[in-house]
Amino acid sequence: MRTRYLIGNWKTNKNLKDAVSFVEQFQQNKLNYNAKIGIAPVYVHLTEIKKIISDSLLLFAQDANFIESGSYTGTVSFTQLQDIGVNNSIIGHSERRKYYNETSAVINQKLFACLKASMQVVLCIGEALGQEISFLKTDLTNCLDTIDKSLIKNLVIAYEPLWAIGTGKTATPEVANQTIKTIREYINDLYDENVANNISILYGGSVDHNNIQKLAIMEQIDGFLVGKASLEIKNFLEMARVYA
C-alpha cells in the first residue's frame, strides 16, 4: 500500500510566534492518523520548530540547494538542512520555477543531491493552462535524468496544475485522478511497473477543507500538498480529520 500524505506548504507566511502556536495546537490534538502529516515553514523558523515538533508531524524545507557549501548568497544547502535535523524538502515548486527561473536541469541536481543523501523529497510538477499533459512526461524525464531507481524510494511527486495554484480553482476529482494515473504511466516508462505502482503521488492546487473529501476518494491520489488552506490551524485540522 502506498504511503499517504497531507503536507502544508506555508510559503512566505507566518511569523515565528504564529508558526510555533500552530505546531503546539496541532500536537495537542491526540488523534492517530493513517497518513503522514507535514508542514513546510520558511527557512528561518525551521530550527525553532524542530525543537518542539513531535513525531506526529514531518518537518519540510521549501527548497534545498544541491551545493554543499560555497559562495552562493541567499541559498541553504541540503547538508545544512540535515545538520539541523531537517530531512525532508519540497523541490521544484512552480513558484521557484516562475520567480527564480529554476530549470529542470537545476531541479535534477537538487533531486540527485537530496535523494543521494537519503532525504525525502516532494517533487512538484504541473502544466500551465493550455499546455498538453504530455508536457509532464518531458518535465519528469528531465527532472529525473540520472536519478537511479535505487534512489526513488525517498521520492514523492506532487501534481499541481499551475492554473489551480492560489486561484481558488481546482481540478475536478476525476481529472486529477486521471492525470495522476497518466503520471504513473510515465513513471512506468522511465523506471518500471513496481516503481510506478508504489510511488506516492499527491494533488495540489486550491485544496481546502471543503473539497478534500471528494478528491480523497479517488484511487490514484495519495495525498495533498496544500498551500493557503494550511495556514489556519482549524482548517488544517479539519483536513487531517477528513483525510488522514
UniProtKB/Swiss-Prot annotation:
Pathway field: Carbohydrate biosynthesis; gluconeogenesis; Carbohydrate degradation; glycolysis; D-glyceraldehyde 3-phosphate from glycerone phosphate: step 1/1
Chief place of localization: cytoplasm
Entry-linked SUPFAM superfamilies: Triosephosphate isomerase (TIM)
Keyword presence, Isomerase: yes
Keywords: Cytoplasm, Gluconeogenesis, Glycolysis, Isomerase
Keyword Zinc belongs to the record: no
EC number: 5.3.1.1
Entry annotation: catalytic residues: H93, E160
Reaction catalyzed: D-glyceraldehyde 3-phosphate = dihydroxyacetone phosphate
Top-level class of the enzyme under EC nomenclature: isomerase
UniProt cross-references to CDD domains, sorted A to Z: TIM
Gene Ontology biological process terms from the UniProt entry: gluconeogenesis; glyceraldehyde-3-phosphate biosynthetic process; glycerol catabolic process; glycolytic process
Gene Ontology cellular component list: cytosol
Location of the protein in the cell: Cytoplasm
Binding sites annotated in the UniProt record for substrate: N9, W10, K11, G166, S206
InterPro entries: Aldolase_TIM (IPR013785), TIM_sf (IPR035990), TrioseP_Isoase_bac/euk (IPR022896), Triosephosphate_isomerase (IPR000652), Triosephosphate_isomerase_AS (IPR020861)
Molecular function terms from GO: triose-phosphate isomerase activity
Name of a matching Pfam family: TIM
Description of how the protein assembles with itself and partners: Homodimer.
UniProt record similarity statement: Belongs to the triosephosphate isomerase family.
Role of this protein: Involved in the gluconeogenesis. Catalyzes stereospecifically the conversion of dihydroxyacetone phosphate (DHAP) to D-glyceraldehyde-3-phosphate (G3P).
Protein's name according to its UniProt entry: Triosephosphate isomerase
Source species of the chain: Mycoplasma genitalium (strain ATCC 33530 / DSM 19775 / NCTC 10195 / G37)
